[in-house]
């Protein structure tokens, strides 16, 4: 049985225990379903001992001692790769500073190293940090040029080629359907249970209320779409500002703001709403977008690398250049579009596809390993 290790390099909420949508765990489940073992590594700065979870057979999650500098983390040892008898590491390291060290360890011990990347340039809000990270990126690029490197989106593939890194192909991000609950009942019944007007036109926004997600654009979106109400699920640094601006604009009565919900209830809102709004013009992928589409909730999204890849414009959703265009697009969403969105995810955006592609590399290990 092959063992694939999937390390996370960034200090991020996505790896916290109890959170439902951990991409690495979704991929691990897909590997297990194909007859492999998968070990997910999450960095835990400040801890001294490893703690583990075993959510299902052949899936192991290890919370590892690590050092941290800002969002960057560094594992104190890669010995776990030998302890777990790793055949390969599935690296989603992008510009992480720990990538070169992992590569050297794998090279020394004959472990296949390959990557699935979403972005390379720093997106830090601090110019000095961006400059330093982009300067240090050359270390990662040297590794990616020597190893099979896949892109999560066509935009990333183009970026890799521009930086002199041969792209081995697209390896798309997938949805972990094992964590998605079944939501029984009609939309009318669901709305009654949620106390949402059965006849209202309602879109849902799900995401962090931070600047990178552009949540403040919900204000002009609602102003330009007077016939619509919004369910806004999320919290973040711009949460209070958003609430204030909605109030000042006289829009707060058309909104339901929810800081945090259990996963099951988030999915209930996908089934209750007429459309899903994605405002981030730099969205590299969009897991909430995939979830909404899987529920049959048609998306209206700004053009960005992720939505441009996922949505077939006019078929499984609508792509727009601006907030006014998004407002107009809301009225063009249909149930048929929602069904097409659901089919789109089922056919192209499940983790099984990525896992199957990755396993082909293990059969070519001698060819790839350098």
Spell out what each predicted region is.
Residues 130-131, 137-187:
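Donor nucleotide-sugar binding/catalytic pocket of nucleotide-sugar-dependent glycosyltransferases
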Residues 281:
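Aromatic "clamp/platform" in nucleotide-sugar-dependent glycosyltransferases that forms part
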Residues 260-261, 268-273:
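Short alpha-helical donor nucleotide-sugar binding micro-motif in glycosyltransferases
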Residues 1-48, 84, 223:
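N-terminal subdomain of nucleotide-sugar transferases
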């Amino acid at each position: 049985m092959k063992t694939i290790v999937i390390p996370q390099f960034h200090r991020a909420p996505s790896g916290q225990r109890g959170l439902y949508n951990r991409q690495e765990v979704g991929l691990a489940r897909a590997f297990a379903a194909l007859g492999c073992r998968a070990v997910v590594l999450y960095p835990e700065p400040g801890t001294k001992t490893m703690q583990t979870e075993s959510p299902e057979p052949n899936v192991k999650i290890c919370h590892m001692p690590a050092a941290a500098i800002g969002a960057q983390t560094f594992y104190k040892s890669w010995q776990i790769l030998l302890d777990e008898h790793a055949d390969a590491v599935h690296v989603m390291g992008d510009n992480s500073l720990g990538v070169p060290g992992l590569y050297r360890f794998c090279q020394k011990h004959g472990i296949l190293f390959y990557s699935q990347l979403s972005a390379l340039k720093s997106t830090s809000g601090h110019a000095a940090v961006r400059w330093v990270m982009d300067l240090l990126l050359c270390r990662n690029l040297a590794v990616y040029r020597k190893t099979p490197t896949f892109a999560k989106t066509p935009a990333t593939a183009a970026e890799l080629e521009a930086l002199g890194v041969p792209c081995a192909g697209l390896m798309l991000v997938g949805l972990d359907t094992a964590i998605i609950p079944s939501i029984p009942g009609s939309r009318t019944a669901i709305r009654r249970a949620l106390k949402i007007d059965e006849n209202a036109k309602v879109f849902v926004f799900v995401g962090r209320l931070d600047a990178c997600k552009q949540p403040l654009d919900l204000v002009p979106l609602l102003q330009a779409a007077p016939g619509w109400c919004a369910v806004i699920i999320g919290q973040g640094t711009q949460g209070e500002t958003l609430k204030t601006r909605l109030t000042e604009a006289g829009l707060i009565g058309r909104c339901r703001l929810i800081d945090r919900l259990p996963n099951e209830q988030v999915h209930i809102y996908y089934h209750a709403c007429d459309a899903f709004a994605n405002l981030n013009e730099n969205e590299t992928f969009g897991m909430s977008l995939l979830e909404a589409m899987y529920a049959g909730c048609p998306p209206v999204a700004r053009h960005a690398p992720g939505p441009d890849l996922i949505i077939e414009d006019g078929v499984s959703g609508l792509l727009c250049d601006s907030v006014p265009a998004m407002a107009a697009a809301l009225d063009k969403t249909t149930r048929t579009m929602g069904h097409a969105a659901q089919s789109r995810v089922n056919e192209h955006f499940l983790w099984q596809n990525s896992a199957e592609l990755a396993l082909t590399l293990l059969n070519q290990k001698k060819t790839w390993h350098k």
